[in-house]
């Protein structure tokens, strides 16, 4: 097997996942913050800020899932039974969230749809964090197949990861509102962003300490020499960006806090890659162990490379077309 094909596919899936987290993350964050809006006018302004983008952002989730199925079928066959419950919860929650987003705009009574949008966004985020936590703590595998139980994922660490992601997406949503809205919505979002930034830093600290204490392989990766000398800039830069984001929020900057939040997510993602690569199903299955035959990888890679520029071009165009702040009375429905 050509060693580089699984690496390329791991990069494609990795990019798809991080793009989904960054882009759909602020959509979900808006839903997480929905209960804190004071009235329907504020909620309308919040939804208008994401109306042109939210459905396109989920394209990356489809690409990541399809890429995993096509390029790493053995990993897909292990991950799915290990996380059936949180995956189903995530998908159902995303469906209800999407339905609520569209129907609240045309419904006379928006209360039920508001609840569905908030609950769907929060549950989808919690499920994603639980899946992440379950992967970090490891999936039992025997003879290439999942050998654990249906609820092995239900651990304190996984739920802490789920709550941490809720705080993270909430921060993305709050800083997005700071960047895209005006008036009371932006002011409340700025206050929420400060509180959520503290929560995110606390969550990152807890997870960063918990992980190496319970997973010796990750502790070795980070703290053995000479690895430590090369990796210490990651937490240091994270702390610096968090400090700058706080200062920018205090200085009432609009765009920089959102960019800083995205940088925090990228650094967190980099930490995950450092901790686990080349394992796709920690702690036993690598990208080479689970890869499809080279012919399948090449065929699907050609199709992906043809479609990916179109998707990226469309997304860039939409974000450029609807740049700037959402004004009162504007609607994209």
What residue ranges belong to the model's regions?
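N-terminal signal-anchor module of multipass membrane proteins
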Residues: 1-56, 62-65
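Alpha-helical transmembrane segments
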Residues: 9-20, 81-92, 118-122, 152-166, ...
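Juxtamembrane membrane-water interface segments of multi-pass membrane proteins
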Residues: 28-53, 69-79, 102-111, 174-192, ...
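Long, contiguous internal "core" modules enriched in hydrophobic/ aromatic residues
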Residues: 103-253
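Central hydrophobic cores of alpha-helical transmembrane segments
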Residues: 258-266
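Short, membrane-exposed interhelical loops at transmembrane-helix boundaries
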Residues: 281-300
């Amino acid at each position: 097997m050509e060693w580089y094909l699984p690496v390329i596919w791991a990069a494609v899936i990795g990019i798809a996942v991080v793009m989904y987290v960054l882009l759909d993350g602020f959509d979900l964050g808006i839903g997480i913050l929905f209960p804190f809006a004071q009235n329907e006018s504020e909620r309308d302004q919040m939804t208008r800020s994401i109306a042109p983008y939210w459905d396109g952002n989920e394209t990356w989730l489809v690409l990541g899932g399809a890429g995993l199925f096509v390029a790493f079928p053995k990993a897909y066959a292990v991950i799915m039974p290990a996380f059936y419950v949180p995956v189903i919860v995530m998908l159902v929650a995303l469906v209800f969230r999407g339905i609520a987003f569209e129907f609240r705009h045309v419904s006379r009574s928006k209360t039920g749809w508001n609840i569905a949008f908030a609950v769907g966004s929060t549950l989808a985020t919690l499920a994603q964090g639980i899946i992440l936590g379950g992967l970090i703590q490891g999936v039992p595998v025997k003879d290439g197949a999942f050998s654990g139980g249906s609820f092995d994922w239900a651990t304190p660490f996984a739920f802490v990861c789920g709550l941490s992601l809720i705080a993270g997406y909430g921060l993305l949503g709050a800083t997005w509102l700071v960047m895209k809205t005006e008036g009371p919505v932006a002011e409340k979002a700025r206050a929420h962003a400060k509180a959520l930034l503290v929560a995110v830093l606390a969550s990152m600290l807890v997870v960063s300490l918990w992980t190496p204490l319970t997973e010796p392989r990750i502790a070795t990766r980070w703290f053995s020499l000479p690895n430590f000398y090369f990796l210490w800039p990651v937490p240091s830069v994270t702390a610096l960006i968090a400090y700058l984001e706080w200062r920018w929020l205090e200085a009432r900057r609009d765009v920089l806090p959102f960019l800083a939040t995205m940088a925090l997510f990228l650094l967190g993602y980099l930490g995950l890659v450092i901790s686990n690569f080349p394992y796709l199903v920690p702690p036993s299955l690598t990208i080479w162990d689970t890869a499809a035959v080279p012919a399948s990888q090449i065929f699907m890679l050609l199709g992906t490379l043809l479609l990916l520029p179109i998707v990226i071009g469309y997304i860039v165009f939409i974000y450029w077309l609807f740049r700037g702040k959402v004004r009162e009375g504007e609607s994209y429905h």
